[in-house]
């Protein structure tokens, strides 16, 4: 694959993943405005975001093993088109809690299809020696989505109206849909390997680690703006602060992927260490101290939510012929955590405080780190004799 084709692959990957992630994080970031417009509680807002991830779980598990059969590019286009439909529904129709809920169910299903599919898309087009960076760039789609969502508060929601945030995301999705290739003309040998055995036990443990780590991170993505407002910042400033945190995660994901290509193994150990550092960031956020918000947010985002690319790279290296299947399983763990994390966070805020919610987030990150370490040991035991660098 030449440099131009590789660049197109990376751009399409991050644009596709960003499009199908935007509905959840737009809803979280715009919550401070939507809440007053539709008279919603914090618990209801958490439920909206969680429903998105709940809808993704069955599709990630069902589509993962069937991606090659159904067609990678075809599935990507279907997922993006479904997301655009959900965004336009929220933007153009008279929204209620129920209508937004239904729209986010459709968007969540599309995201469940997209994640294992775009993993296969990447590995089918990028050579092994560059896949760590490729996954880092692809996983940077999530902080890019939260960055755009954070900027949507001061630049869109507080100026021309919150619905225009969804409309802008829909336009981005339409451009992405057009950019997705109709056929795979850049396939690499890596993408066409014979299916390898999926080691289910270790993958389930690692999926649990994903659940706890991502549950904490997605709660942060959904509620950091609201938490910053509670700490005394204006909604506009709170949105900018969230965007700064998202930018740090964006950079970390790309750089961690870059270094993963230059490191022989131990990728899951790095993931566990990053989760532990992220827990410190959550604890600092629990202080609700305006002077610490920027540092705590950057630490929590960069470490607590910067590990996903390295994680997926490790899974693809240990399952070179069953990439979509294996990452579909671990992605389901991420969705489970993302389902429960924002909902629990919202309940804790409503019944206790933001401080308690951030402390629970820190505990979740620590549990996730422990699960990653245990899962790595189990995976290495199962794959003894195979030099695949977990």
Predicted regions and their residues:
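Extracytoplasmic gate region of multi-pass secondary transporters
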Residues: 27-28, 202-243, 249-254
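Helix-to-loop junctions at the C-terminal end of transmembrane segments
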Residues: 59-71, 253-265
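Cytoplasmic membrane-interface "Motif A"-like loop-to-helix N-cap segments
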Residues: 69-80, 262-275
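C-terminal ends and interior cores of transmembrane alpha-helices
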Residues: 82-95, 277-289
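Helix-loop-helix hairpin linking two adjacent transmembrane segments in secondary transporters
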Residues: 99, 137-181
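Cytoplasmic helix-loop-helix junction between adjacent transmembrane helices
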Residues: 104-141
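C-terminal transmembrane helical hairpin of 12-TM major facilitator-type secondary transporters
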Residues: 266-311
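A late C-terminal transmembrane helix in Major Facilitator Superfamily
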Residues: 321-354, 361
